[in-house]
Amino acid sequence: MTTQSLKAEAVALEADVMALDAEAKALNDKLESLDLAGRLALIAGLEGRAVFTTSLGIEDQVITAAIGSNRLDIEVATLKTGRLFNETVALIDQTEETYDILIKRYYPEKADIDAYVAQYGMNGFYESVEARHACCGVRKLKPLARALDGASYWITGLRRGQSGNRATTPFAEADVERGLIKINPLADWGIETIQAHVAAEGIPVNPLHSRGYPSIGCEPCTRAIKPGEPERAGRWWWENDEKRECGLHVPEAASSIIPNASNAA
């Protein structure tokens, strides 16, 4: 490729990024004044595929209930990592039955898991941040990429009150890496509002929430929190970094350290 071609490609890419960012900002302004049902209906009515990825947490259940109850044209997907709590797995079927919807499951590739285990061991994520990020990459990031392939809008259950590094979460933001717009319809909902809504609407939730698990991920990487701790304090609790994330919502350099199945011994 010539230098001129590279420059033209860079200019085109920059234009795409600017357009995505402008659309996200315009959407953010529109979503702010709407209620949850209105926010989701607005996204469902846009041109392009909208995908909601649920971890079956309490806020995700609120969104799933709104999608199902209003029969919105939004795909619902979940990442079956292979290390989920039994309670979480059971809730998938219960939620499908309750709202007569399909929750599409996305699984990690066996070859990727084998490569990870060969390099780090089954529970190597306890040994280093690098190994933990690699596990999240294999079990979450790669399946997520398949779930979002071809999507224009990615709906999440992110809330500003979940952790310090989510405190400025907007209703809509450009995800340049994935080439789509991320929608956070519950960004301004507090946990008390979530709990009251769940109780009023009879929304099924994970029983682990009542046992001290406000944030629930994979079983080996989640513990109950102590009184007064932040909502996500039980996630990867053995790590010291306050910005503990799996890489789904906050890109992390080490999340690119995903074992290559072709190099597995």
Curated annotation (Swiss-Prot):
Binds 1 [4Fe-4S] cluster per subunit. It is an enzyme of class 1 (oxidoreductase). It catalyses: [thioredoxin]-disulfide + sulfite + AMP + 2 H(+) = adenosine 5'-phosphosulfate + [thioredoxin]-dithiol. It is found in: Cytoplasm. The active site is at C246. One of its GO terms (biological process) is hydrogen sulfide biosynthetic process. Pathway: Sulfur metabolism; hydrogen sulfide biosynthesis; sulfite from sulfate. [4Fe-4S] cluster binds at C135, C136, C218, C221. Keywords: Cytoplasm, Iron, Iron-sulfur, Metal-binding, Oxidoreductase. Its cofactor is [4Fe-4S] cluster. It comes from the Bacteria. GO terms for molecular function: 4 iron, 4 sulfur cluster binding; adenylyl-sulfate reductase (thioredoxin) activity; metal ion binding; phosphoadenylyl-sulfate reductase (thioredoxin) activity. Its EC number is 1.8.4.10. One of its GO terms (cellular component) is cytoplasm. InterPro entries: APS_reductase, PAPS/APS_Rdtase, PAPS_reduct_dom, Rossmann-like_a/b/a_fold. Belongs to the PAPS reductase family. CysH subfamily. Catalyzes the formation of sulfite from adenosine 5'-phosphosulfate (APS) using thioredoxin as an electron donor. This is Adenosine 5'-phosphosulfate reductase. It comes from Rhizobium meliloti (strain 1021) (Ensifer meliloti).
